[in-house]
A protein has these predicted regions:
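Short alpha-helix
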Residues: 232-254
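Conserved class I S-adenosyl-L-methionine
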Residues: 157-209
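A short acidic, Gly/Pro-enriched loop at the edge of an enzyme's catalytic core
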Residues: 117-128
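Conserved alpha-helix/loop element of class I SAM-dependent methyltransferases that forms part
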Residues: 30-61
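N-terminal, positively charged/glycine-rich alpha-helical extensions of SAM-dependent methyltransferases
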Residues: 1-35
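Core SAM-dependent methyltransferase catalytic element
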Residues: 267-311
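A short glycine-rich, Lys/Arg-flanked "PGG" loop and its adjoining helix->strand segment in the class I
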Residues: 142-154
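Class I SAM-dependent methyltransferase SAM/SAH-binding core
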Residues: 62-64, 70-118
Length: 311
C-alpha cells in the first residue's frame, strides 16, 4: 500500500460526497446547495461533533487541520475563533474547502495540498493539530505522528478522531455480520440476483479477485469495510493502540461517540455511543523532546475521560 493509491482513492471519492448524491452529479456543481445538504446530513448523523469541538478552546490558537473532507469541521473551527490552516492529501478536497471558505467569507491563515508524512510547515508552527477521521487511513502513522509533533509548539496537542476497536461496528458488524453475509452471498455472485446491491457486488468482485478466504481475513476485510469496498487502508484503535502508535504524545483524554453499525438498525434504538461508539476522540499532548514514552500501559476499563479533563 502506498500513498499514491490512498491519494487516488480519496481524490476520486471525496469523503461523504456520494452520500448526499455528489457535487458533480445531483448538485450540478452548485457548491452552496451541496455544502448545505452535506452539513445537514453530517450534523444529523454525527450530532455529537459540535459538542465535542466545544470541549476544546480554539480561540486565538494557531490550528492545523489535517484531512479536510468537505470542510465542515474547517468552518466549525474558524467560527470558534481558530487561526486556521488546512492540509489535505488531495487537490479535490483543497479546492472544495477553498471554495467553501471563500463563499462564506471565512478568514483563515493557509490552505495547502500535501502529506502528513512531510508536513509543509516549519517546526513549532501550531498550538493545536486537529484531525477527524484521517489518521487511521495512514499506513505509516509513526512517521505521521512524528511530523505532527514537529510542527507543534511546546505544550501543543493533537485532537483526533480515530475509528474505535471496541465498538459495535467493529466487533459485531464488521467482524461478524458483514463477513458472514458476504460468505453467504458469495455462491450467488454470478447469478444476477445482486445487481441492485452495488456495494455488495463490489465486495464480491474484490473477493473473487483475491480469493474469498484471503478477503475475509480481518486484516484485509477491515480496510474494505470502513469507507467502502474500494478504500485501500484503514485501521481501528483502542486507547492502548493510540498510546502505541503515537509515542511522541501522551494520551490525556478520550471519549467514544456515535453508535453506528450498518446494516444493524442501531439508530432506532436511541442508545448512547459512550461505550460501543465507532468514533474514538482522543487528546494527545506533545511530549517534550527529551521525554520518550515509557512503554505501553495496559488497556483499562472505559471511562469518558474526554469530558472530565480540561482541554
Amino acid at each position: 500500500m502506498n500513498q499514491e493509491q490512498i491519494k487516488s482513492f480519496w481524490n476520486d471519492h471525496p469523503c461523504g460526497d456520494h452520500i448526499v448524491g455528489g457535487l458533480h452529479q445531483r448538485f450540478d456543481d452548485d457548491y452552496e446547495r451541496f455544502f448545505a445538504a452535506y452539513d445537514a446530513w453530517r450534523y444529523d448523523q454525527e450530532s455529537h461533533i459540535p459538542a465535542m469541538l466545544d470541549r476544546v478552546d480554539w480561540r486565538g490558537k494557531r490550528v492545523l487541520e489535517i484531512g479536510l473532507g468537505q470542510g465542515a469541521e474547517s468552518e466549525q473551527l474558524i467560527r470558534r475563533g481558530a487561526l486556521w490552516s488546512g492540509l489535505d492529501l488531495t487537490d479535490e478536497s483543497v479546492d472544495r474547502v477553498r471554495t467553501r471558505l471563500a463563499a462564506r467569507a471565512l478568514p483563515y491563515e493557509d490552505l495547502r495540498q500535501g502529506s502528513v508524512l512531510d508536513i509543509p510547515w516549519a517546526d513549532d508552527s501550531f498550538d493545536l493539530v486537529f484531525s477527524h477521521g484521517v489518521l487511521h487511513h495512514v499506513p505509516d502513522v509513526h512517521r505521521a505522528q512524528a511530523e505532527i509533533h514537529r510542527v507543534l509548539r511546546p505544550g501543543g496537542a493533537l485532537v483526533a478522531m480515530l475509528y474505535a476497536r471496541h465498538s459495535l461496528n467493529y466487533q459485531v458488524s464488521i467482524r461478524l455480520v458483514r463477513r458472514a453475509a458476504l460468505a453467504a452471498a458469495y455462491p450467488l455472485r454470478h447469478s444476477g440476483r445482486l445487481a441492485r446491491a452495488p456495494m455488495l457486488r463490489q465486495h464480491l468482485d474484490n473477493a473473487e479477485r483475491v480469493g474469498l478466504r484471503h478477503y475475509l481475513a480481518l486484516d484485509t476485510f477491515t480496510h474494505r469495510s470502513t469507507d467502502g469496498p474500494l478504500n485501500p487502508f484503514a485501521r481501528v484503535y483502542s486507547t492502548q493502540d493510540a498510546r502505541r502508535d503515537f509515542p511522541s504524545f501522551e494520551l490525556v483524554a478520550a471519549s467514544k461517540c456515535y453508535l453506528h453499525a450498518p446494516p444493524l438498525p442501531v439508530r432506532r434504538l436511541s442508545l448512547s455511543g459512550r461505550r460501543m461508539g465507532w468514533h474514538l476522540w482522543v487528546r494527545l499532548d506533545a511530549r517534550p523532546e527529551s521525554t520518550p514514552a515509557q512503554g505501553v500501559p495496559a488497556e483499562t476499563a472505559w471511562t469518558d475521560e474526554f469530558g472530565e479533563v480540561s482541554l
